[in-house]
Each structure stands twice: as structure tokens, then as C-alpha cells.
């Protein structure tokens, strides 16, 4: 998630970007000085597995699972995507686009580049542009989600700038799959589960989170995170088994919902006055306005987390580390917070460790005083950082943008194209294409 534009202190380390990889086993961090990868195999130690200082002002850095393939965008060249083999320190290829790159999504089949009013679908094996979705509704936040499942390889993005419509696109067969009327307000967050069969959505209002079946678009679950105030949802994330869904926002509370269907018990005739009254009350809900009836049927949080800050943009993930379910929160204050989740009882989650995203660690009982509740909310989009003056015009590239192509690739290193297997996390997909 983009954290550019944070008006911050030295504690944030000039953080511009943070995101978990597809299976939540590593964390990528982009900053003014370059980018880093951290392993998430331990709670006690945040192990730095790689650091690059060759590229400054890294505003997007996405790693393909645990492979060496990484996609990078810099504020100094915001229209240029570089695909690199970070362990070898080599650039595989690059592409230039017609506008600022707002988001990049990866799985083992596709690479998606999101611009404000278009989406480019690349074949990750050779980086050819397979399809371009043009003239999408304005999407200045670069909101989109890509399923990590090879068989259910769907892309979700806003279908409207004024209401919460979700467009679902099949990136394998390159055709529209469905349009889901998810919310009345514009979309704020999207997330697929690992199987690609569920999609979680939240609107700018931020009070209700819904889960739909994919590609059918049937509403499966509806959760209410609150009724007192509207919030800005920063992040939605499923656990890898699809049983839990976390939602973080610009408030201090992270909600975790359990995706379970309550089995209906056979109806029995009430034998007491209270039982009869309860039956009448439930029957009466059918006469209430639909909005009120929905509130009766909405699920509540199974577990919650109280963050030591309020107002920071953040990214959350549900991961199993050392055989224990954890909630991970990477925040614009430059820290990664690790909480334990009780999968049976839920309730308030326990803060186990907090790590600085420079690799150092602080005990759970030493919460920083600087993480106060009156800190301003960070800029919501990468484009906001550009408009604040961070943008520096990029140097001329080998290929200029042309309207016919939309995305133009640079040279590819030939020695990177041999003997590389897509299903090996220690390697990356073979890049065999060269430009037209």
C-alpha cells in the first residue's frame, strides 16, 4: 500500500511504500533511499533478506511470492515500470506508460499495471501486453485487486467513480466476468481470498464490509465494523485459508471477521413467554425497512486489535508464523506490529512485538510516544505525493510512449531468459519477449 506523502519524522524513515507478498511470507518496503525485503518467518526477529540502494524514491515495489522477481516504480520515473532479478542485481525489462503508474499487481500468470483510467494486463512469462482495459472510471487511488490463484485468475477494479460497482475481469480468457453492485458509495478497498472464489469490498463510508462469491457475484457475508462514525478503510486481507478477514482503517481499531455460516436450527414452538416474544420480534423484522433488517443480519467482529496510533495509513495481513495465527500491520509510522489471534475465542488480540522497518525491534511494552492520536492522516494515493511536488520528470527513455501501443518495453537481458522455472520460488518466470 502506498504511504507516499507522509508528513513525518525521522521515525518513519521516509517510508513511501509497504506491502506483503502474495502469501504473507515477506514484506516489501520502499523508501527515499531504495527498497528492502524482510522475511516474516519469526516474531522475535524481522530478518532483512535484501536491500537495494541503487534506485531512490521507490514508491512501488512488488515481489512475486518468494522468488527473485520484483517490479519497481520510482517517483523519479513514475510512468516507468522496471522488472528485475534482485538476487542477481539485473534488470530484466522495463515498460513505459502513458500516465503515472498507481499500482502493480502480480501472480504467477499475470502482471497488472494500473493507471488512473486504464489497466494493462501482461503475461508474466514474457511481459507481452495481452490486453488493455481502457477508459475505466477515474481511479486516482489505483484501487484494484488480483487473485493469486492460477485457475481463478480474476482482476477486480471500480466500475464507477460515484457508486460502489465492482468490475470483475477474467485475466486468463481476457473477458469481463461480472459486474457487482457492492455498495451505494464509491469503493475504498478490495481483496480476493487465496482461492480466488471470494472478494471482499468496502466503500468510502467504511461502515459495512461485504464478501461476494466469484465469479457469480452472490453476496455471501456482510459485516458491520461500526455505526457511530464513517471511516476510511485502508486495507482488507483474508487469511490464507479464507476463514478470517481483517479490515484496517484510519482509526486505532483493526477488525477481524470470521467467515462462518451459522447453521439454522429446526424451528420449535416456544414454550415460554420470552420464547414467544423472541419469535414475534424476529418475525417483525420482515416489516421493517430493508436498511434496518440488514443491520439485524450483519455480522460483528470476531476479534479486534487496538493500534497504538490513529490516523496513519496502514496495510494489514493475516499470517501463520511459527504455527500461530497472527495479525500483521505495517504502518506509515515506520513500524510493523505483530499480534496474536485466538482462532477459537477471538476477542482482543495481544501485541507481541513491534519492529522498526529498518530491521531493529522494540519490546511490545515500549510503544512509541510519537505514535499519538493526533497525527494527520497520510496522503491516500501515490498521485497525491506527485501533486505535492515529489515528482521529478524522468529522463528520456530508450522508447517513447506511442498512442498505438500504450505500453512500450525496453531492452531485455538475454541471459535472464534461460533455464528459469515459474513454479520455483527461488527463481522467477522466464522473460523471453522482446519489444515489437
UniProtKB/Swiss-Prot annotation:
Name under which the protein is recorded: WD repeat domain phosphoinositide-interacting protein 2
Query: What does the entry's free-text domain comment contain?
Result: The L/FRRG motif is required for recruitment to PtdIns3P.
Taxonomic lineage from the root: Eukaryota, Metazoa, Chordata, Craniata, Vertebrata
Entries under InterPro entries matching the protein:
PROPPIN (IPR048720), WD40/YVTN_repeat-like_dom_sf (IPR015943), WD40_repeat_dom_sf (IPR036322), WD40_rpt (IPR001680)
The residue spans of each WD repeat are 182-222, 228-267, 311-349
- This protein's species is Gallus gallus (Chicken)
Q: Does the keyword Transcription regulation apply?
A: no
State where the protein is found: Preautophagosomal structure membrane
The alphabetized UniProt keywords are: Autophagy, Lipid-binding, Membrane, Repeat, WD repeat
Q: Does the keyword Repeat apply?
A: yes
Amino acid at each position: 500500500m502506498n504511504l507516499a506523502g507522509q508528513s513525518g519524522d525521522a521515525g518513519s524513515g521516509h517510508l513511501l511504500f509497504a506491502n506483503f507478498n502474495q502469501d504473507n511470507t515477506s514484506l516489501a518496503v520502499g523508501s527515499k533511499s531504495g527498497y528492502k525485503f524482510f522475511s516474516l518467518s519469526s516474531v522475535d526477529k524481522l530478518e532483512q533478506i535484501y536491500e537495494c540502494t541503487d534506485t531512490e524514491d521507490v514508491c512501488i515495489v512488488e515481489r512475486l511470492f518468494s522468488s527473485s522477481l520484483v517490479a519497481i516504480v520510482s517517483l523519479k520515473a513514475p510512468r516507468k515500470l522496471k522488472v528485475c532479478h534482485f538476487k542477481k542485481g539485473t534488470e530484466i525489462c522495463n515498460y513505459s506508460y502513458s500516465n503515472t503508474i498507481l499500482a502493480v499487481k502480480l501472480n504467477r500468470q499475470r502482471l497488472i499495471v494500473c493507471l488512473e483510467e486504464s489497466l494493462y494486463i501482461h503475461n508474466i512469462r514474457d511481459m507481452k501486453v495481452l490486453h488493455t482495459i481502457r477508459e475505466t472510471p477515474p481511479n486516482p487511488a489505483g484501487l484494484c485487486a488480483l487473485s493469486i490463484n492460477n485457475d481463478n485468475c480474476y482482476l477486480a477494479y471500480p466500475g464507477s467513480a460515484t457508486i460502489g460497482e465492482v468490475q470483475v475481469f477474467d485475466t486468463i480468457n481476457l473477458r469481463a466476468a461480472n459486474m457487482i453492485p457492492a455498495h451505494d458509495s464509491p469503493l475504498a478497498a478490495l481483496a480476493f481470498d487465496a482461492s480466488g472464489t471470494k472478494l471482499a469490498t468496502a466503500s468510502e463510508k467504511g461502515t459495512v464490509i461485504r464478501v461476494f462469491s466469484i465469479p457469480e457475484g452472490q453476496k455471501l457475508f456482510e459485516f458491520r465494523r461500526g455505526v457511530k462514525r464513517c471511516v476510511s478503510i485502508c486495507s482488507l486481507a483474508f487469511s490464507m485459508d479464507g476463514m478470517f478477514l481483517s479490515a484496517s482503517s484510519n482509526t486505532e481499531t483493526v477488525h477481524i471477521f470470521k467467515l462462518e455460516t451459522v447453521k439454522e436450527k429446526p424451528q420449535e414452538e416456544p414454550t415460554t413467554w420470552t420464547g414467544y416474544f423472541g419469535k414475534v420480534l424476529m418475525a417483525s423484522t420482515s416489516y421493517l425497512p430493508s436498511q434496518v433488517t440488514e443491520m439485524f443480519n450483519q455480522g460483528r467482529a470476531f476479534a479486534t486489535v487496538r493500534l497504538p496510533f490513529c490516523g496513519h495509513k496502514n496495510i494489514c495481513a493475516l499470517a501463520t508464523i511459527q504455527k500461530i495465527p497472527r495479525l500483521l500491520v505495517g504502518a506509515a509510522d515506520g513500524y510493523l506490529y505483530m499480534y496474536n489471534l485466538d482462532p477459537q475465542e477471538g476477542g482482543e488480540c495481544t501485541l507481541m512485538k513491534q519492529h522498526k522497518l529498518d530491521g531493529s525491534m522494540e519490546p511490545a511494552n515500549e510503544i512509541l510516544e510519537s505514535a499519538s492520536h493526533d497525527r494527520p492522516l497520510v496522503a491516500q494515493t501515490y498521485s497525491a505525493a506527485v501533486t505535492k511536488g515529489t515528482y521529478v520528470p524522468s529522463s528520456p527513455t530508450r522508447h517513447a510512449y506511442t498512442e498505438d501501443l500504450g505500453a512500450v518495453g525496453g531492452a531485455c537481458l538475454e541471459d535472464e531468459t534461460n533455464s528459469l522455472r515459474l513454479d520455483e520460488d527461488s527463481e522467477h518466470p522466464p522473460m523471453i519477449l522482446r519489444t515489437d
